[in-house]
Design a protein with these regions (language model features):
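Positively charged n-region of N-terminal signal peptides that target proteins for export
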Residues: 1-4
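Core segments of small alpha/beta cavity-forming domains
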Residues: 32-111
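Low-complexity, intrinsically disordered terminal/linker segments enriched in charged
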Residues: 136, 141-166, 170-173, 177-212
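Residues embedded in well-ordered secondary-structure elements
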Residues: 6-9, 133, 156-158
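Surface-exposed, charged secondary-structure patches
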Residues: 81-155
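Boundary at the C-terminal end of the N-terminal hydrophobic targeting segment
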Residues: 18-20, 25
Length: 212
């Protein structure tokens, strides 16, 4: 029977199992939902591989959201959904006001990297894991270093800036998931779980926004 298949068909049969084994960084985001066998550091590595691929500013959306959401804790997902509700409420109420006055939106998280930091740290091109530390029962802090690449025109060489942060991983439903983040070198030192003053209960309670 193998003779009738031909050499090409036999080759395809032999490599078929390998074709189904995709690395995490290249797999479809929907396939990352089952990460029960991963260590805290492995979960962080997969999460930040996606983050440095999509580089979302503010709340992840689209493909970034589909990739990152399954790797987050239920608490963190609820927090981001609340922020999204506040963001929707803000633009529903003030979009016309912002356009008329040419004001920048007054949402604190809109241009931040929620899992890497503000300003240039918001869009890292690379990351490295420096260390990990158990900080409680089924709770691990992973220390990260981010690299931001600044490119220039006219033949000038790129410049690289480095930032650091700590991501917290917790055990939930027998798997490790991302639960919190704090950027280092930022004053005041604020965790993502501390929330934002302008957002309460899914509604925007801050100011509409003014020029700097």
């Amino acid at each position: 029977m193998l003779r009738s298949l031909g050499a090409a068909s036999i080759f395809l049969l032999l490599i078929a199992p390998a074709l189904g084994q995709n690395p995490a960084a290249k797999s479809d985001p929907g396939q990352e939902q089952r990460n029960s066998g991963r260590s805290p550091v492995e979960v962080v590595r997969v999460f930040y591989t996606y983050l440095t691929t999509y580089r979302p500013l503010g709340i992840p959306k689209g493909r970034a959201k589909r990739a990152l959401w399954p790797l987050m804790s239920k608490r963190l997902v609820r927090e981001l959904e609340t922020l999204q509700s506040c963001e929707d409420d803000y633009f529903r109420r003030y979009a016309e006001y912002l356009r008329a006055n040419q004001f920048k939106p007054g949402i604190g998280w809109l241009e931040d990297g929620l899992f890497s930091g503000p300003n240039e740290a918001a869009s890292p091109s690379k990351f490295s894991i420096l260390s990990s530390k158990t900080v409680g029962e089924n709770r691990v802090d992973v220390h990260l270093r981010f690299t931001h690449k600044q490119t220039y025109c006219c033949g000038y060489p790129p410049q690289y800036e480095h930032y650091e942060g700590v991501v917290t991983v917790v055990l939930e439903d027998d798997r490790f998931v991302i639960d919190d983040f704090v950027a280092r070198g930022v004053t005041p030192l604020v965790r993502l779980s501390d929330g934002y003053a302008g957002c309460k209960g899914g509604q925007w309670v801050g100011r509409p926004g003014e020029p700097d």
